């Protein structure tokens, strides 16, 4: 099963200059909880923004250029990335924008954090048809001392 996990501000903004323009430790904990012990697939720019392999997960990076870091597995295509995951029960696609776009048609599940923030961004989550997805989980949280904005965790499954 292929799943996409992303945090989206208003207008599906997911990043600005290769970073996330908000401070939400609760979202990072949600991300870790849902990706731990699963393969994670990302693009080269996402890999560079993280700067290190995510522990407890097989890290796979899609890039047209050969990678030099042997702590992760480098592949050149979506199909190679899927093959590199072997018989994993769930593959977690963690970004960025182009990688989400390539995997969305193959995805069975979306783990989305909707952030109540209007921020400028240069990277967006791809547009998806809400009629193709059913919300199976939703949990709202107000902003607090640790989290800069209110947010809602949602899990969608393809109908």
Swiss-Prot record:
NADP(+) binds at residues 7, 13-19, 45-46, 63-64, 76, 95-102. GO terms for molecular function: dihydrofolate reductase activity; NADP binding. One of its GO terms (cellular component) is cytosol. Pathway: Cofactor biosynthesis; tetrahydrofolate biosynthesis; 5,6,7,8-tetrahydrofolate from 7,8-dihydrofolate: step 1/1. Residues 1-158 form the DHFR domain. Keywords: NADP, One-carbon metabolism, Oxidoreductase. The keyword Oxidoreductase applies. GO terms for biological process: dihydrofolate metabolic process; folic acid metabolic process; one-carbon metabolic process; tetrahydrofolate biosynthetic process. It catalyses: (6S)-5,6,7,8-tetrahydrofolate + NADP(+) = 7,8-dihydrofolate + NADPH + H(+). It comes from the Bacteria. Belongs to the dihydrofolate reductase family. Key enzyme in folate metabolism. Catalyzes an essential reaction for de novo glycine and purine synthesis, and for DNA precursor synthesis. This is Dihydrofolate reductase. The lineage of its organism: Bacteria, Pseudomonadati, Pseudomonadota, Gammaproteobacteria, Enterobacterales.
